[in-house]
């Protein structure tokens, strides 16, 4: 019986994490008016010409990057080989 409770608790935590990630993705992709990051984050967080923005979710500030063309990743740290920039 205890094993079933552990499985249920694990499943509930999994659902909560999944819902949180979906919420962040939906908000960052669908909300055109993002707040700019504070200067100390804007200068350090996004790489390769990415633009830092913040979104407040459930009272917590979340900092993300909008990558310049040709880059991807949470901090725009990876070259996007699927969408290279013409040089």
From Swiss-Prot:
Keywords in alphabetical order: Disulfide bond, EGF-like domain, Glycoprotein, Secreted, Signal
GO cellular component terms, A-Z: extracellular region
Disulfide bonds: 37-52, 46-65, 67-76
Subcellular location: Secreted
SUPFAM superfamilies: EGF/Laminin
Pfam families given in the database record: EGF
Domain EGF-like: 33-77
Reported tissue expression: Expressed by the venom gland.
Coiled-coil portions: none
Signal peptide: 1-32
PROSITE patterns xrefs: EGF_1, EGF_2, EGF_3
Gene Ontology terms for molecular function: epidermal growth factor receptor binding; receptor ligand activity
Main location: secreted
Family: Belongs to the EGF domain peptide family.
PANTHER family the UniProt entry points to: KEREN-RELATED
Protein name listed in UniProt: U18-myrmicitoxin-Mri1a
Source species of the chain: Manica rubida
């Amino acid at each position: 019986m205890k094993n079933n409770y552990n499985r249920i608790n694990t499943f509930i935590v999994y659902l909560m994490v999944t819902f949180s990630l979906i919420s962040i993705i939906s908000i960052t992709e669908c909300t055109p008016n993002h707040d700019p990051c504070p200067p100390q984050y804007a200068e350090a967080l996004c790489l390769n010409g990415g633009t830092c923005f913040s979104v407040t979710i459930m009272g917590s500030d979340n900092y993300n990057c909008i990558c310049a063309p040709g880059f991807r990743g949470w901090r725009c740290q990876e070259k996007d080989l699927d969408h290279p920039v013409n040089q």
